[in-house]
């Protein structure tokens, strides 16, 4: 039977490019949906996001999706992307501080306006290709080399509260969590749908993953 992948639509995300990338890797039925019943019935769920975290969390709470995300991420493969990843943390310092869903301990921090590396001033947002160092083996890293490059666009980074949940490290002036995992949940700061070969491989791995780790 064909599996169903739900891409959660709460009005804040690069939804159709994510959906197209999932279709490209053979995800089966890909449904971009804001219907809680459709999302609950899906075999696996993707939670993308772009924009300001305050706006994202306001919509998530208005739709009741904070509880929905907690529910559906417990018992099936679940992938958070970019701001969708940041929303899974406890709190973001963006917009004078915003409480988030709290599935992963930790904070979302601003890179700052005075970010330097080896004497060079770094522009914020962090935009472009950067390496991800794999901290541990995980099914979603299958056939992706360590230090592979992925595409990032973000002004805020994740300071993880539990180092054991960090499965991928990034560096841009400061070290940050590029990927987090716990049980059937996996979340990435980068955009796999924009990351060419390695990004598509990660999505293909997600589609094949049974949610165990």
From Swiss-Prot:
GO terms for biological process: L-histidine biosynthetic process. It catalyses: 5-[(5-phospho-1-deoxy-D-ribulos-1-ylimino)methylamino]-1-(5-phospho-beta-D-ribosyl)imidazole-4-carboxamide + L-glutamine = D-erythro-1-(imidazol-4-yl)glycerol 3-phosphate + 5-amino-1-(5-phospho-beta-D-ribosyl)imidazole-4-carboxamide + L-glutamate + H(+); L-glutamine + H2O = L-glutamate + NH4(+). Keywords: Amino-acid biosynthesis, Cytoplasm, Glutamine amidotransferase, Histidine biosynthesis, Hydrolase, Lyase. GO terms for cellular component: cytoplasm. The active site is at 82 (nucleophile), 191, 193. Pathway: Amino-acid biosynthesis; L-histidine biosynthesis; L-histidine from 5-phospho-alpha-D-ribose 1-diphosphate: step 5/9. The keyword Transport does not apply. Residues 4-213 form the Glutamine amidotransferase type-1 domain. CDD domains: GATase1_IGP_Synthase. Its EC number is 4.3.2.10, 3.5.1.2. One of its GO terms (molecular function) is glutaminase activity. Pfam families: GATase. InterPro entries: Class_I_gatase-like, GATASE, Imidazole-glycPsynth_HisH. It is found in: Cytoplasm. Signal peptide: none annotated. Heterodimer of HisH and HisF. IGPS catalyzes the conversion of PRFAR and glutamine to IGP, AICAR and glutamate. The HisH subunit provides the glutamine amidotransferase activity that produces the ammonia necessary to HisF for the synthesis of IGP and AICAR. This is Imidazole glycerol phosphate synthase subunit HisH 1. It comes from Pseudomonas aeruginosa (strain ATCC 15692 / DSM 22644 / CIP 104116 / JCM 14847 / LMG 12228 / 1C / PRS 101 / PAO1).
């Amino acid at each position: 039977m064909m599996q169903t992948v739900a891409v959660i639509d709460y009005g804040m995300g690069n939804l159709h490019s994510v959906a197209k990338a999932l279709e490209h890797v053979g995800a089966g039925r890909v449904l971009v949906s804001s219907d809680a019943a459709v999302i609950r019935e899906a075999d696996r769920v993707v939670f993308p996001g772009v924009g300001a975290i305050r706006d994202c969390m306001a919509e998530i709470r208005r739709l009741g999706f904070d509880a929905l995300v907690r529910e559906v991420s417990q018992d099936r493969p679940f992938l958070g992307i970019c701001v969708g990843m940041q929303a899974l943390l406890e709190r973001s310092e963006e917009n004078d501080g915003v409480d988030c869903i709290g599935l992963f301990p930790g904070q979302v921090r601003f890179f700052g306006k005075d970010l330097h590396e080896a004497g060079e001033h770094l522009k914020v947002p962090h935009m472009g290709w950067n390496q991800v160092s794999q901290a541990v083996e995980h099914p979603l890293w299958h056939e992706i080399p360590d230090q592979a490059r992925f595409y990032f666009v973000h002004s805020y980074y994740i300071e993880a509260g539990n180092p054991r949940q960090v499965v991928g490290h990034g560096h841009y002036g400061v070290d940050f969590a590029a990927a987090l995992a716990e049980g059937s949940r996996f979340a990435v700061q980068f955009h796999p749908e924009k990351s060419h070969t390695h990004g598509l491989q990660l999505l293909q791995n997600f589609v094949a993953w049974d949610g165990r780790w």
